[in-house]
């Protein structure tokens, strides 16, 4: 193997510079140069620029006698030179310029030395990318937020620090703190007695969150107990007590970015739970009844990453069994880590989720450590722009018997989407949370809560609309409480199938009973619905409207009528019919009021009351009694009917392609039921938004209309419902099938989106429903679902660009600019790779799982269940729908534009810094232009000094600082190298200097795109220093993760240009860069942290190329260590150029 020397003189660079500014002259004879040119031209015409005796540069063609002599001499020298480095063939840093005969030399040099150049293709690509990027950002900011209707809470907070929770209880006492909340003027307490009287609740703040965020929830708990619960003796006897809110101050730690921090917080939570429970054993600190058991468990409420910390605590070794049985999380990313830049956070998430899945996969409850735990995940919806609400889903972790996911827009009397922070203080939301907690508390039990099944029923009642298929009806569990006696002249019995319409109430004195006969059983698809603007009375209440489900009460059944709580009997006739009735208010569903003046579902107006039962739920009843109890005439209405599913349910048989091309239009007939449901199975993706319009074909403001149309948009998993009052035009977006989400534990049929429309059936008019895809609004959905793509895909672009630069350099000796390399990649490898990735995305989405019988390892799994691959959606787009294959080239296009923009921003910064550097460097007075081509571009310290600096940095990485800090230092050093290289290239205008400047700049751009992967962990480390927590990370001290970067950057500080590789080993560089590009596209979103290690391997390969050139040996290494080898100094004959 032969290594080509870099022997071109600095005069050749001057000749090249003059060639860039003058036209080429014809070749002519001249004297032989003092030193032969050691490069053999391979293709085209090679121009040998040498100074003659007069000092003038003269171009010489290959056909001249001088060239033939040089070529022969050089070939002879190469043939007798023994191979020194068998691994790679190293070529010189400075070469004769090779160009095709028809290419102007001036253009070639201009392209070589102008990093600002931009081809038409690159310009058009950038403009198109900017248009798409602007449209996406504008759509996200303008169309994805919605209105803000949260009420402002009132509170008087006091935080008591638990000073007793010190280093005797936890090793984190100096970093974290535990507090108790007391509402000033409401909660009795003093320094000796904390006033602990109820069930303990522990609040966990989120990433960089404050413990003070709990004050709105805790204040509502104190006030609601003092104003309502404390005066309800029945609830007090049932075990309801106050809620003692504790909270942890995590010192605004950032658990979302660092897995070890997450584990530390979980460990502290378990220690805090043990300490809280111990407080209730001390009678001096509590005001509890002596006959009540001491608490053995704590309710956990976590916001954002605090919810993940709560789940993690149950997997830790210091967790006390059954010390936690209820967890409520708000905007917590359960399904997937919010960012994948840290390996620890990705691995920790996997371990936590695997533990929960394994626990709930157990057949027997005794084998499930989480059997008594209920987990409720609450998401804010599209207003949350910090954590994608799709990640709040727990369907892949917990079965429906132990938890569910719900959105705030679903919760009764809340009906509003909230952002990431307002979910902790929104007035409507906090009241629903606190009321549900008071319902599940039972201090008569050591667990302080009701049994798991009862807790789940209560949470469904408070958090779900009641219209879901999983909602339970309590009517069948109740006993008859009202005896109704029928009289012919005071009661109305409607015919079978007739609709009851009450337009006013209170026209008769005394209760007016309206009876609807229940259809006979066996009629499929029958449903009872009732809607009214009045609140439904419970038994014994003196309101205006009561709904009863009745069965005939026999005259002689041995049961006295006195056992009923209420006896509606206005007749003394012994032959009158009597009905034993159950009150239906227990199943009352609140719907937002929809009138002609309504604007939003969350308006502060009295909600509508709604009842809905399937015919099977009414099997033991014969009549539905609607009792008008108003004593005086009053405004109020009610509509009740039995309807057929064939009339009330419309299933749209249309695909996504049909929606995109023509949309969907449904006309509801005039004789429709009050409730009509339009179900569209094709609508399941969270990446598409829609426009829906409801048009009523009757005169606006019709006085006969009892209420304006009310629309509910819903999906079953997760439980997301949105209500639209006085509906006309609606922007529809949903959180259905989302990218990168793991599959659910139990596969269910995909029913898509359901639209339920309540309209006044008495208006006798048709209604048109039109649905179309909203392309502009859909662009905004890409931000939250694919925001990490914009950190991964640019690495693909940069890798392919650098790959093209190295290919050209190894072939020609010119290291082209980043802009030229990007343009070349756009014309060659990049479109092919994006096309291949598009085909891969389509195939991944359409691939199906092999049947169990075809699986060679089927014997190792449960024969009755197919194992679920929870990582199958981690690749590429993470989409289960092949329709979105076009997102790959779209993201590629946008990232090309982003890389071009960043390139020019970096060039501007370098230009400014190089000017500053030039002004500072002008004090030295001269610029040295070395005569030997392989000397450094600019002076550098001795090898021994460089090795000492690298050694110190590596020792610090292995002991005190994370390698991410060393990477940041390397980026800064590389930036300084680029500044110096660019200034020297402009001053000397030599090809070698331009080569090195382009090479150093491209490496800097590559490192710059890897920097975001490391910067988040670095922020965690810096935060720990700020809070005086100096314990080093147990991870991120792997020296091998940073050593190649340090050596490469330190080597480049000497100005050494990387040698050319002309053997087959040049393909190693190409393959490594291509692998980085492919990995960035396929795994870059889900496992971004590995990109750092891949680029680290590339840096190691580049370092090895340097070593092969310098003839690395142990002997020379020891000479450097001992200080015997010093850097080369310029010869006395060096050309010196005086600075202006």
From Swiss-Prot:
The active site is at 304. It is an enzyme of class 3 (hydrolase). This is GPI inositol-deacylase. Its main location: endoplasmic reticulum. It is found in: Endoplasmic reticulum membrane. One of its GO terms (biological process) is protein transport. Keywords: Endoplasmic reticulum, Glycoprotein, Hydrolase, Membrane, Protein transport, Transmembrane, Transmembrane helix, Transport. Residues 1-84 are annotated as: Disordered. Involved in inositol deacylation of GPI-anchored proteins which plays important roles in the quality control and ER-associated degradation of GPI-anchored proteins. It holds the Pfam family PGAP1. The chain crosses the membrane at residues 117-137, 782-802, 882-902, 905-925, 952-972, 1002-1022, 1039-1059, 1070-1090, 1094-1114. It is a multi-pass membrane protein. PANTHER family: GPI INOSITOL-DEACYLASE (PTHR15495:SF7), NEGATIVE REGULATOR OF VESICLE FORMATION-RELATED (PTHR15495). Residues 55-78 have a biased composition (Polar residues). Its EC number is 3.1.-.-. GO terms for molecular function: phosphatidylinositol deacylase activity. Glycans are attached at residues 63, 862. Belongs to the GPI inositol-deacylase family. GO terms for cellular component: endoplasmic reticulum; endoplasmic reticulum membrane.
């Amino acid at each position: 193997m032969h290594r080509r020397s870099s022997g071109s003189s600095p005069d050749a660079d001057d000749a090249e510079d003059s060639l860039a500014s003058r036209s080429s002259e014809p070749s002519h004879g001249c004297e032989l140069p003092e030193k032969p040119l050691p490069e053999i031209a391979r293709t085209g015409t090679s121009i040998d620029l040498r100074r003659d005796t007069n000092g003038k540069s003269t171009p010489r063609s290959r056909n001249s006698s001088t060239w033939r002599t040089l070529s022969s001499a050089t070939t002879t020298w190469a043939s007798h030179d023994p191979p020194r480095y068998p691994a790679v063939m190293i070529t010189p840093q400075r070469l004769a310029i090779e160009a095709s005969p028809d290419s102007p030399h001036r253009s070639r040099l201009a392209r070589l030395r102008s990093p600002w150049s931009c081809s038409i293709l690159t310009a058009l690509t950038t403009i198109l990318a900017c248009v798409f990027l602007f449209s996406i950002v504008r759509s996200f900011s303008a169309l994805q937020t919605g209105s803000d209707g949260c009420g402002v809470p009132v509170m008087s907070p006091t935080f008591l620090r638990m000073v007793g929770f010190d280093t005797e209880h936890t090793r984190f006492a100096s970093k974290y703190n535990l507090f108790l909340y007391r509402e000033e003027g409401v909660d009795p307490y003093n320094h000796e007695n904390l006033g602990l009287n109820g069930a303990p609740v522990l609040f966990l703040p989120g990433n960089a969150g404050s413990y003070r965020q709990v004050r709105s929830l805790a204040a509502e708990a104190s006030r609601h107990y003092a104003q309502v619960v404390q005066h309800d003796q029945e609830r007090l006897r049932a075990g309801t007590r106050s809620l003692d809110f504790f909270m942890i101050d995590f010192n605004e730690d950032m658990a979302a970015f660092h897995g070890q921090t997450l584990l530390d917080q979980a460990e502290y939570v378990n220690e805090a739970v043990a300490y809280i429970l111990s407080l209730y054993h001390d009678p001096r600190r509590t005001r509890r009844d002596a006959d009540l058991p001491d608490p053995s468990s704590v309710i956990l409420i976590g916001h954002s990453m605090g919810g993940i910390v709560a789940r993690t605590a149950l997997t830790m070794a210091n967790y006390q069994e059954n010390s936690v049985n209820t967890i409520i999380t708000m905007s917590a990313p359960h399904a997937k880590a919010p960012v994948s830049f840290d390996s620890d956070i990705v691995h920790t998430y996997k371990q936590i989720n695997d533990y929960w899945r394994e626990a709930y996969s157990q057949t027997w409850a005794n084998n499930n450590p989480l059997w008594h735990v209920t987990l409720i995940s609450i998401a804010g919806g599209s207003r949350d722009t910090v954590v994608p609400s799709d990640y709040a889903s727990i369907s892949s972790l917990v079965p429906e018997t132990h938890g569910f996911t719900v959105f705030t827009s679903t919760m009764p009397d809340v009906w509003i989407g909230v952002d990431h922070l307002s979910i902790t203080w929104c007035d409507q939301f906090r009241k629903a949370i606190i009321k549900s907690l008071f319902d599940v508390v039972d201090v008569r039990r050591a667990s302080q809560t009701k049994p798991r099944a009862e807790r789940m029923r209560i949470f469904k009642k408070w958090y779900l609309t009641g219209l879901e298929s999983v909602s339970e009806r309590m009517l069948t569990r109740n006993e008859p409480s009202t005896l109704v006696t029928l009289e012919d002249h005071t009661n109305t019995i409607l015919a079978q199938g007739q609709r009851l319409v009450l337009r006013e109430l209170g026209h008769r004195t005394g209760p007016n009973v309206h009876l609807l006969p229940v259809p006979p059983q066996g009629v499929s698809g029958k449903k009872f619905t009732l809607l009214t603007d009045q609140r439904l009375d419970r038994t014994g209440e003196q309101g205006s409207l009561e709904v009863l489900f009745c069965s005939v009460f026999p005259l002689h059944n041995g049961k006295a009528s006195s056992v009923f709580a209420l006896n509606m009997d206005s007749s003394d006739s012994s032959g009158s019919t009597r009905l034993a009735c159950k009150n239906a208010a227990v199943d009352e569903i609140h719907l937002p009021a929809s009138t002609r003046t309504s604007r939003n579902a969350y308006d502060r107006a009295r909600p509508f009351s709604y009842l809905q039962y399937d015919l099977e739920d009414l099997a033991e009843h014969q009549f539905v009694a609607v009792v008008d109890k108003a004593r005086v005439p009053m405004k109020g209405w009610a509509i009740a009917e039995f309807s057929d599913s064939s009339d009330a349910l419309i299933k749209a048989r249309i695909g996504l392609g049909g929606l995109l091309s023509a949309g969907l239009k449904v006309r509801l007939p005039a004789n429709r039921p009050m409730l009509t449901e339009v179900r569209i199975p094709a609508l399941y993706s969270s990446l598409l938004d829609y426009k829906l319009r409801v048009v009523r074909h009757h005169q606006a403001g019709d006085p006969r209309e009892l209420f304006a149309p009310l629309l509910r948009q819903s999906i079953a998993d997760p439980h997301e419902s949105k209500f639209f009052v006085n509906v006309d035009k609606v922007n529809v977006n949903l959180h259905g099938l989302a990218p990168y989400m793991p599959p659910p534990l139990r596969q269910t049929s995909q029913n898509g989106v359901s639209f339920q429309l309540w309209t006044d059936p008495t208006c006798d008019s048709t209604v048109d429903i039109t649905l179309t895809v909203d392309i502009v609004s859909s662009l905004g959905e890409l931000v939250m679902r694919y925001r990490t793509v914009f950190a991964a895909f640019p690495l693909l672009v940069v890798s392919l660009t650098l790959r093209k630069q190295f290919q050209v350099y190894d072939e020609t000796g010119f290291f082209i600019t980043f802009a030229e390399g990007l343009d070349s990649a756009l014309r060659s490898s990049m479109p092919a790779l994006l096309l291949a990735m598009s085909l891969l995305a389509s195939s991944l989405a359409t691939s199906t799982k092999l049947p169990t019988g075809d699986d060679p390892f089927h014997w190792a799994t449960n024969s009755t269940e197919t194992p679920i691959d929870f990582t199958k959606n981690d690749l590429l787009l993470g989409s289960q729908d092949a329709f979105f294959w076009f997102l790959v080239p779209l993201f590629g296009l946008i990232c090309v534009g982003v890389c071009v923009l960043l390139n020019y921003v970096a060039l501007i910064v370098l230009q400014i810094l190089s000017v500053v550097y030039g002004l500072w460097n002008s004090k030295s007075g001269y610029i040295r232009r070395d005569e030997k081509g392989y000397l450094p571009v600019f002076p550098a310290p001795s090898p021994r000094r460089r090795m000492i600096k690298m050694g110190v940095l590596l020792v610090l990485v292995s002991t005190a600082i994370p390698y991410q800090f060393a990477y940041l230092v390397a980026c800064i050093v590389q930036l300084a190298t680029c500044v110096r290289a660019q200034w020297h290239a402009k001053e000397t205008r030599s090809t070698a200097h331009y080569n090195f400047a382009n090479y150093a700049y491209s490496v800097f751009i590559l490192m710059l795109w890897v920097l975001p992967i490391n910067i988040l962990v670095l922020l965690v480390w810096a935060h720990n220093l700020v809070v005086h927590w100096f314990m080093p990370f147990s991870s991120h001290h792997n020296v091998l993760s940073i050593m190649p970067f340090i050596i490469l950057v330190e080597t480049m500080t000497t100005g050494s240009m990387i040698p050319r590789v002309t053997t087959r080993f040049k393909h190693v560089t190409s393959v490594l860069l291509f692998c980085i590009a492919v990995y960035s596209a396929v795994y870059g979103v889900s496992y971004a942290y590995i990109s750092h290690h891949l680029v680290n391997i590339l840096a190691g390969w580049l370092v090895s190329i340097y070593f092969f050139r310098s003839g690395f040996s142990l002997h020379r290494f020891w000479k450097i260590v001992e200080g015997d080898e010093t850097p080369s100094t310029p010869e006395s004959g060096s050309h010196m150029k005086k600075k202006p």
